Curated annotation (Swiss-Prot):
Signal sequence residues: 1-21
Annotated spans, Disordered: 37-59
Source lineage: Bacteria, Pseudomonadati, Pseudomonadota, Gammaproteobacteria, Pseudomonadales
Role: May be involved in the regulation of synthesis of phospholipase C.
Protein name: Phospholipase C accessory protein PlcR
UniProt source species: Pseudomonas aeruginosa (strain ATCC 15692 / DSM 22644 / CIP 104116 / JCM 14847 / LMG 12228 / 1C / PRS 101 / PAO1)
Gene Ontology CC annotations of this record: cytoplasm; periplasmic space
Keywords attached to this entry: Cytoplasm, Periplasm, Signal
Keyword DNA repair: no
């Protein structure tokens, strides 16, 4: 009997000690709780930058030569997205327009542009209107930007006029067949242009 009483008193003593500790350390009123801070807005994970295959879009690797850019576009167009193709084609069209402004032949340039406009406008009627608008702009650029030849260019033109007359006279005197005459004159004039101007179709003669 006595051991049971001893254990009971010991249990009551321990409970009293625990309750006292709780009352001592736990405040009578709860401390005010700060309102919940708005959780930071989740920022979408940054998508890895995919370098465009389009030349205008990736200037670090785009070739400087416009002809090379056109060739690269033709090779890679099938691998581009629709948006990339359109943006690249528009960029090339603008470059071709600028070429006319500095002396390129508007007709040849327009032929190149017509290969690009289907990537800009898929609808046939709208594309036709776009082609017409571009052609008129090219004609305006060509007429406004024509410049007088420099003294050096004038000398080249005079030399070409004199030498080409000699070439034609020599061929007419030595070749009887008309078709052969045309072919011979064409070949010799090409060689003469390359000799004088450095190229077979100099822009100076297209002004």
């Amino acid at each position: 009997m006595r051991p049971t009483l001893t254990w009971t008193l010991l249990a009551l003593l321990l409970c009293g000690t625990a309750i006292g500790a709780v009352l001592l350390f736990y405040p009578s009123e709860p401390a005010p709780v700060a309102p919940f801070a708005s959780p930071p807005q989740a920022t979408p994970a940054a998508k890895p930058s995919i370098p465009s295959r389009a030349p205008e879009m990736n200037t670090a690797t785009a070739p400087d030569n416009l002809e090379q850019q056109l060739g690269e576009f033709g090779r890679n167009a099938g691998q581009m997205s629709e948006i990339e193709r359109k943006q690249a084609a528009e960029g090339l069209i603008e470059q071709l327009k600028r070429e006319v402004a500095v002396g390129a032949d508007p007709r040849q340039t327009f032929e190149e542009i017509q290969r690009l406009t289907p990537y800009v406008e898929a609808d046939a009627r709208r594309r036709e209107a776009l082609d017409f608008e571009i052609w008129m702009a090219l004609k305006d650029n060509a007429s406004v930007q024509q410049q007088a030849p420099t003294p050096g260019e004038e000398e080249q033109l005079r030399e070409y006029a004199q030498e080409s007359d000699k070439v034609i006279a020599e061929v007419l005197a030595s070749v009887d067949d008309e078709e052969q005459r045309h072919a011979a004159i064409d070949e010799r004039l090409k060689a003469l242009r390359k000799q004088i101007f450095g190229e077979e179709n100099p822009r100076l003669l297209q002004r």
